[in-house]
């Protein structure tokens, strides 16, 4: 089963872990992406996320389909992404995958976060400490529609 969620609520690692747990699985691999307190020498106080929600959920589901095609022994997949304000140290994304053995779940989580960054329409704005330029919408250089990606890849 796939457990996909976009939410303005704080993400709970235990919740997604419980959702993907299964008695036939000996492995649950997790990725937790958090807000760090700095970027390019600026002090970050929080991130703000927006999404094209319907398309984001559709794309997240496509990522799950790709994971299942590559690692057929995967049992459950959870992808939760936070929207709105995310303070420093809090999770903005949690990905969890269960499988009978660790290799599949570890590889699948790694693939999932890379694909999420490349293809899911979620945007972030960094809020900086006072006197450091207030805030800035960030281009995700990994996403397929970004100028940086187009400049460095032949389409």
UniProtKB/Swiss-Prot annotation:
Which pathway, per its entry? Cofactor biosynthesis; molybdopterin biosynthesis
Q: Which residues form a coiled coil?
A: none
UniProt keywords, alphabetically: Cytoplasm, Molybdenum cofactor biosynthesis, Transferase
Q: What class of enzyme is it?
A: transferase
Annotated residues for binding of substrate: 101-102, 117, 124-126
What EC designation does it have? 2.8.1.12
| Protein's GO biological process | Mo-molybdopterin cofactor biosynthetic process
Reactions accelerated catalytically: 2 [molybdopterin-synthase sulfur-carrier protein]-C-terminal-Gly-aminoethanethioate + cyclic pyranopterin phosphate + H2O = molybdopterin + 2 [molybdopterin-synthase sulfur-carrier protein]-C-terminal Gly-Gly + 2 H(+)
> For this UniProt entry, what's an example GO CC term?
molybdopterin synthase complex
Gene Ontology MF annotations: molybdopterin synthase activity
Q: List locations, semicolon-separated.
A: Cytoplasm
Record family assignment: Belongs to the MoaE family. MOCS2B subfamily.
Q: Which PANTHER family match?
A: MOLYBDOPTERIN SYNTHASE RELATED
The subunit field of the Swiss-Prot or TrEMBL record says: Heterotetramer; composed of 2 small (MOCS2A) and 2 large (MOCS2B) subunits.
Q: What does this protein do?
A: Catalytic subunit of the molybdopterin synthase complex, a complex that catalyzes the conversion of precursor Z into molybdopterin. Acts by mediating the incorporation of 2 sulfur atoms from thiocarboxylated MOCS2A into precursor Z to generate a dithiolene group.
Further information in the entry reads: This protein is produced by a bicistronic gene which also produces the large subunit (MOCS2A).
Name listed for the protein in its UniProt record? Molybdopterin synthase catalytic subunit 2
Q: Which organism is it from?
A: Aedes aegypti
The top of its lineage is: Eukaryota, Metazoa, Ecdysozoa, Arthropoda, Hexapoda
**What gene name is listed for this protein?**
Mocs2-2
